[in-house]
Regions:
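Membrane-proximal, proline-rich intrinsically disordered regions
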Residues: 28-78, 134, 306, 315-319
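Aromatic-residue-lined binding/catalytic grooves and analogous aromatic/hydrophobic interfacial grooves
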Residues: 29, 210, 227, 232-260
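Hydrophobic-face positions in mid-chain alpha helices that act as interaction patches
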Residues: 54, 84-86, 93-96, 206, ...
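Inward-facing hydrophobic residues that define packing positions of alpha-helical scaffold repeats
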Residues: 56, 121-124, 202, 209, ...
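Alpha-helix C-terminal capping/termination sites
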Residues: 64, 157, 161-164, 239
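Conserved, well-structured interaction surfaces
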Residues: 93-162, 196, 214-219
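Short coil/linker segments at helix-helix boundaries
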Residues: 161-199, 203
């Protein structure tokens, strides 16, 4: 299985590269609006292999941000679930609106999640358009594979949260989300982009993942590798109810990735390092302030707000 969970890694230091001209249609009321000292201009960043690699690391960091896999995507999935599964005790009105299925256009959580995802997509587009500066053939393939994996991952979440539902066996011409495959650097003009169909978005996601699989190595430290991309592709096919492809690709991962499930389920969580069943895990630290899973699920001694989200007894009794 593909696991997107946070890691409380005590000594992990990851680089968040902010490129001043790559902010896309979003600002965050919960963050200070400052120019980071580490920021560099786009032309400098894309002029060397090291710069391209740093943009890629920044794309990972943004994907693991609290707006996305650092907590909010998981929180939305819970809050949008059947009310019989959980309670929302929190005081954040915007999250309460999501739980009530009454989301208005200026919901800052929704805005920031969408904006953060497109920031990652824009960064991956920058990388893919400037791969020529990477001269080492193996590095070039790997970087292309990782960029397309991250782009596919973010589009898959965007279309599921912001597009209409995929309907198996139909044309799926219902509206999905805008597909943007070229770098945006000028944010002063009209940035509106028409929405693509759900079918078009899924087609792009599958294309990116197949190309990612072809380029990624089978092992790649804690970054995405070929089996990460295969596992995500299996999940995409499962969402499409293409069970044959989902099964075949999942079996490939199970049989060949070298990964295995933990003997004790609870040992898969609250670990200080990646574990045997992690095909891909976001490297999110509790110290970085980006771990919204801790904020809204954990008790106060663990750094949370006391449990804004809790499960119902009826749901717990199912286990």
């Amino acid at each position: 299985m593909l696991i997107f969970k946070t890691k409380q890694m005590k000594n992990l230091k990851y680089l968040i590269l902010t490129i001043s001209s790559l902010f896309l249609l979003t600002s965050c009321d919960r963050d200070l609006d400052i120019n980071p000292e580490q920021g560099i201009d786009t032309e400098t960043a894309i002029s060397t292999p090291e710069g391209i690699q740093q943009i890629l690391i920044g794309a990972y960091a943004n994907t693991g941000d609290g707006d996305l896999f650092g907590g909010d995507l998981q929180i939305y999935a819970d809050l949008l679930a059947d009310d019989s599964y959980l309670y929302w005790w929190g005081t954040y009105a915007e999250l309460g609106n999501i739980h009530e299925k009454n989301i208005i256009s200026d919901n800052v959580y929704v805005r920031d999640t969408r904006g953060r995802a497109y920031k990652v997509i824009n960064a991956t587009n920058v990388i893919l358009e400037n791969l020529s500066v990477v001269k080492d053939a193996d590095d070039k393939k790997r970087i292309e594979g990782e960029a397309k994996f991250l782009r596919a991952l973010n589009y898959f979440e965007l279309v599921r949260f912001f597009g209409k539902q995929y309907e198996a066996g139909k044309n799926n011409t219902q509206l999905g989300v805008p597909i943007v495959l070229k770098t945006v650097t000028d944010f002063n003009g009209d940035l509106s982009v028409a929405r693509n169909t759900v079918e078009e978005v899924y087609t792009q996601v599958i294309k990116d993942l197949n190309e990612s699989i072809a380029n990624l190595p089978e092992e790649n430290s804690f970054y995405a590798d070929a089996y990460s991309a295969k596992a995500l592709l299996s999940r995409v096919y499962l969402q499409k109810q293409d069970y044959t492809n989902a099964r075949n690709i999942a079996n490939d991962v199970i049989e060949n990735s070298g990964k295995s499930l933990m003997t004790n389920y609870k040992d898969a969580f609250n670990t200080s390092e990646n574990i045997s069943e992690d095909l891909f895990a976001m490297q999110v630290t509790s110290q970085s302030g980006e771990n919204d899973l801790i904020t809204f699920y954990a008790d106060e001694p663990q750094g949370g707000r006391g449990g804004d989200i809790s499960l119902t007894e009826d749901y717990l009794n199912l286990f």
